[in-house]
Structure formats: C-alpha cells, structure tokens
C-alpha cells in the first residue's frame, strides 16, 4: 500500500519546494495551467498510495498553504474515522439480541480501538501546530502515533472470525483506512521534509526508506543468552554501562538499573526502589491483586507509577488502560512472580485474540522487569496470548512469556525486549509494531498432533518504507523438553508472512536443528511471500541453513544490508540515544 512512499530524492525536493514556498510543483504532464492551489495539492499528494483520493479530499480546500492543506487533510481523516467508529457501533445495534457472544465481544473491542484511534488523531492534530516546519523532534512521535491510528482499525478487522461480518466491517471502514494510509504517506514524505529542511538536515535517506550508510563490521556476542532468573549481562549495542537501552530516559534507566529482584535492586544489592504500590498475595502489601495496583495508578501520569509485585502466582487477567501510562512493574524473578490466566479464542466464550491476553497493555511507556506472564489455555485453545502490548516505547527486561499460539503479541508502537524467555508453538511472536528482541531464549513447544510451529508472524501491511517489523538479535532458538525427541519430525519454521509487507530480521542468532532447512513458511491461501521482507544475517548453529532457504527470503552477506535493523535505527529516532549523553554504537 505504501510502496509508493519510496520516491526519488529529487521528487522529495520538489515537494519540499512547494512546502516551503521555494519552487512550484509542475505535475508529471507538465501542465503549467494548474492553479497555485492545485499545484500545491498535486505536490502533497504525489507520493500517497491513493493519489486520486488524496486530491479529491484536498481539492475543495481554498488555500495553497501546505500547512493549511495538510491540516485540512488530517481533519478530513478524523471525519472519516468518526464515520467508521459510528458504523461499527451501529452494526452491533443492527444485529440486535441475536448477536453471538464472539461477535458482540469483537464489536465492543472495535468501538474501543476506534475511540483510541480518534483520541490519538486528535492529539496529532493538536501537536501539529500552525507551522509544520517547526515540528522538530516531534515528527517521529507523531508518525508513530499515526501508524497506530491505522493499526487500531486493522485490529478491529483482525479479531473478527466470522467471514460475513469481517467483510461488512471492512467495507464500512475502507475510506478511513485509505485516508489514514495517505496521511501516513504525507507525514513520511512532505512533513518529514519540511521538518528536516527547517533543521538544515541534508540527509534524505530516511525519507526514502533507503538503508542507512553501513557502520563498522559487526561484532557478534558469542556468549550464551542469559537466563532471566540469572545475573544480568551486557547487550550488543544501544546499551549503556548499566545494561539499559540509551533511548530510555535518564530517570528510567536509573530506575531499571536499581530494580533487581525484589525491592532491593542493583547487582550488589542494598539499593532500594521507592515504589508507589506493593502487591502481595499474603496481604503484606497495599493490594492482593495486580489489577488493584494498576487501577490505583494515576491517569495521564507525567512520572512513573512503580508497582512491586511480591513472589506468587497471580491468577488474574490484568488490563492496563490507555490513560494509565508510564507504569513500571517488577517482581522477584521471572519464575517467582507470575501473572497467569486461561483465556483463548477456541475455548473461552466471547473472546478474541486481543482479548485473550493475560496482560493487556494499552498505554504508553510500559516497563517490566523480573516478571513472568503466562497463558495456560494450551494448544487446543488456539489464539491465547500471554501479553499484548499496544503502547509505544515499551521496555521489558528479564521477563518470561509462556503460551502456545500467539504468546507474545507485540501489537503496536516501538518495543524493546532484552534477556527474556518466550515459549510457544504457532506465530508466538507476532504483531504490527517496531520490535527488537535481544539476548532472548526462544523455546519452541510441542503443540497439537500434526501441528507445525512458526516462531514469528509480522503484520506490516503499510509498506517496506515503514518501521514495522520484528528483529531478533543474538537470541537462541531451541526446542523444549517435550518437543526435543520429535524436533526433527515436527516442522518448525522461523516465521510466516501474516500481512503483505511482513518484515522479520534474524541476526547473530543461534538456531537449533529443529529449524527446517527452508527456514520460512508461506501463509496458506495468500501470496504475501512475494512482497514480504525476510532477512537472516550472521546466524549460527545447525538450523542456520544459509544455502537452503526459500528463494523469497534473503540471507544478507554484509552489515550494510541489516544496519537499518539495529536497535538504534529500528527503534529511532537517533536523538533518543544522543539525548542520553552516553557512548553508543550506531551500527552492528
């Protein structure tokens, strides 16, 4: 859909010329008779996925000012999004009392995510201001939110199991999806160009989706992946001396460094983390359930709400609402402090994939350390997530995620996982976010009889120019104890393309002999393998068959081919790292 985003630098400069009033855009037919207003409209719409729709939307706007035109486009997108939200609500009303529990659940969820989309779009419009050339460092955050607005709409569709209902909702929300896609294109090209030109940035590679200049030759960490219940160890890159990603704020880095197992953290012990709430099953804290502590955290919090969860098995489903931002929860160890629940699409009445998750994080700035998250539905439950993270800039260290199908749902935003364990069978690391998972043990389990295993399933349908995809770096992929005797007969693949532009990069990772030589699997009934982006680089182990992979996946031969997928680049912008004021390696 957004393949057209990758346009030439010359075209970008022409568009920027319109945006800053330096030159006038002449369309490709050389029509100099266009009015100044239509020249500006044509310039703004040049790189959009649906140019006709873009021009039709902006044609009535009586202005040639790109700021006013783009603001008008965003307001029109909001109007269409409101119509889509109303449509999903009215669909539920029209179905009346005969509606099935699952359809009611999914339409209720649709109403919720459309509300989130409208809230975020309103925030984007407010943050845009009157002069987009002054948007500065906010541009990357706004682009991320805008991608989220699109993802919320597809969340609704992805959760619908009934074909007729999915078709009806898909047709009803089609216009808002088209306008949102065009808005992302405009931000990715025109607005980004305006901001960069104003800041006198002469490097336009990031606006064209090109791969950044290669860094130094890769340095591979050959040491074993750490156990999340064991001592901490250093990451490959984008890490300061405390082992915390440098794009995390200074205060949060100090907090994560302090928070060891229990309230006393630090490698030497003795450093006390000042918590807001303590959860304990034995009543020694303020609350006995995790949800009670989450509910007690303030909404729209500028600081951190810190929850210490004492050792215990907490059998509950925890929902962190969108307004409960900046929550940090930590426990006594990934096997000692565990949140567990049993909810699945196949076995639980009125459940969707999104609603199956044991922990559901809708808010931004979520952090977790020394925690376990589990869904006990089993392979017969089908989709059954241990955690679903929707919020941007999530940081999760030393945690464990156990399930079968769809264990770790990295659904939206930018997410960073380090030193974790993830277990599952089918698509057990999946979503539509920009996610980097480093130094993590990936455990493939034995599923139902005759079932194959797929580690990843990325859901990028916006285009290869977007930072949406899953990156595994310096991980280990191994079978669990029950699968080990059958690991050579049960087919296990690195992943399969869930959406058209599915993006997955696996580098510097050890692969056991359970991985099939072909590596990747086609999504049955779809042709997404023809347009996806699957890349392997510098992997090792008996499962790393570089010369026997499917011909639609790529085995990279140089650092230049994967440098754009490092934590610093994939989870950018780079100023997040620079503002941390610590040494950082940009490349591999």
Curated annotation (Swiss-Prot):
Pathway(s) it belongs to: Glycan metabolism; pectin degradation; 2-dehydro-3-deoxy-D-gluconate from pectin: step 1/5
Naturally occurring in which organism (per UniProt): Arabidopsis thaliana (Mouse-ear cress)
Catalytic reaction list: [(1->4)-alpha-D-galacturonosyl methyl ester](n) + n H2O = [(1->4)-alpha-D-galacturonosyl](n) + n methanol + n H(+)
Domain of life: Eukaryota
Single Gene Ontology BP annotation: pectin catabolic process
Site (Transition state stabilizer): 405
Protein name in UniProt: Pectinesterase 4
Cited SUPFAM superfamilies: Pectin lyase-like (SSF51126), Plant invertase/pectin methylesterase inhibitor (SSF101148)
Lineage of producing organism: Eukaryota, Viridiplantae, Streptophyta, Embryophyta, Tracheophyta
Binding-site residues, substrate: 353, 383, 496, 498
Pfam families cross-referenced by the UniProt entry: Pectinesterase, PMEI
Statement: the UniProt record of this protein carries the keyword Transferase: no
InterPro entries found in the cross-reference section: Invertase/methylesterase_inhib, Pectin_lyas_fold, Pectin_lyase_fold/virulence, Pectinesterase_Asp_AS, Pectinesterase_cat, Pectinesterase_inhib_dom
Tissue specificity remark: Expressed in pollen grains and pollen tubes.
NCBIfam families: PME_inhib
